[in-house]
Amino acid sequence: SGTRYVIEGGKEQSLEEMGAPEGTTFLIRNLFYNTPARSKFLKSDMTEAGYINTLMEQLALSHPEISFKYIQNRQVKLSSSGNYSVKDVIYSVYGREIAKALLEVSYENDFMKIEGFVGKPEISRGNRTFENYYINGRYVKNKIITKAIEDGYKGLVMQHKFPFVSLRIEMDGNDLDVNVHPAKREVRFARETEVYTAIYETVRK
C-alpha cells in the first residue's frame, strides 16, 4: 500500500491511502498556473525539458542504488535499475558506445575516497558536459577538481577536447564548504592541494 498526496497551488488538497508499487512517483502539471509572470522568463519547452533531463541524469548517476524513471509527455526519457551499478546507469544515460569505452578507477587517502569511471580519449567531447563528479552524493562543480581532471588528461586528448569522467567522492564534511552558492552546486575545500593531487592521480593512472 502507499499514500496519495495532492497539492495544488501550495495548498493540501488530499491525503489518502491507496494501492501502489514500491517507490515514489511525482506527477507535475501546470506548474506555473498561479504565477504566470514567472513562466514568461522560461526558455523554450525543449530547453527547459533539457534542464530537467540533465538533473535526472545527475540524480541517477549520483545515486545508483535508487531506481529512477523519468517520463515526459508520456515518453520515457530515462530509466535506471537501482542495482548499485554506476556503469549500468552510464549505459542507460549515455549509451553503449560510451559505456564500453570506460576504465574503472579508485583512490583512497586519509580524508577522501574516490570511485568511478574515466573515458578513453576517443570519447572526449568539445565541451565539459561529460565531466561529472559527485561529493557525498551531491552533484557539484569545483575549479580545482575540473583542473585536476583536465591536467590528468593532458597529452591524451586533443586541444579543446574534454574527457568523460564520472567520479563519486566521499569526504568528511569538515573538509568541505558547501555554502558557497545557494543551490550548493559550488564547493570549497580546506585542503585544496591534496584534493587536486588525489583527483589528478585517480585520472592519470
Where are these regions (language model features)?
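N-terminal phosphate-binding caps/lids of nucleotide- and nucleic-acid-binding domains
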Residues: 1-205
